[in-house]
Amino acid sequence: MKKVKKPLVFLTGLALCAALSLPQAESARAAATGSDPALAAALETLLRERPEIILDVLRQNSEAVLDIAQQGSNLRRKHNLEVQWRKDMENPKSVQLENRPVLGRPDARVRIVAFSDFTCHFCEQASKNVEALRKTYGDDICLIFKHLPLDEKGPGGIASSYFVAIAQQDEDKAWKFYDLMFSNRDRLLAEGEPFIKESAQNLGVDMKRLSRDVRSKKVSDILAEDQKDAQKLGVEGTPYFLVNDLVVRGALPLDLFRDAVEMARDGKKGAKP
């Protein structure tokens, strides 16, 4: 018997799974996997003679077919990430954490180190996911924010300098400033430093000290260390996270980010200072 063309039969099975009742769908799956050679051969012959059949089925069930394809894509992405993360766990990362404010318990089982930019849309999205994770895992998670603005002299870079400087006075106020920058990203982009100063003043920051600290060598050294850490890790864009030693690139969907936290929590301690 001639070997059945797998892509053709698989597409047939996909369409039939979307369109038919469960017993029929099981037969389609049997054909797609080759467990029923006679049925597979019959389907191949039919579709070669009447290819419009499968096109009609796909059109009539386009949403179901897309859902099936998306589920497969999501499973593949999850698998690829888990493979990467298992490798990451065997490759400890070292970054500078001294003099950085910590949101949460410093001895938390999972330390999330974020390389981010206050003006980045995807960073804003990712910050919401991190907050959701902190609510879910509580004291098991802490966050450290490292600065990687696209434009060091633009609003993102200026906001980074202010965050570090405010943290020298009061770490709680620095994290409130962090929230204000991300939640008002449009104003940050449009108004720049005047909005940044207004936000700091509204938080009750000592503005005279802030004006000195923001231009101090201590602040510039911390920001320079963040840049060096990013280069050492090969960070190519923001957001970028170390979840202990696991690397998370981009604004990963919350469910996948949660998978990284679960794996890190059950694995090794990471990201040594």
Question: What is each of the regions a protein language model found here?
Answer:
Residues 2, 34-46, 64, 68-69, ...:
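C-terminal cap of thioredoxin/glutaredoxin-like
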Residues 39-42, 50, 54, 126-129, ...:
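Stable alpha-helical elements in mature extracytoplasmic
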Residues 113, 124-201, 231-236:
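Structural alpha/beta surface segment adjacent to cysteine/selenocysteine redox centers
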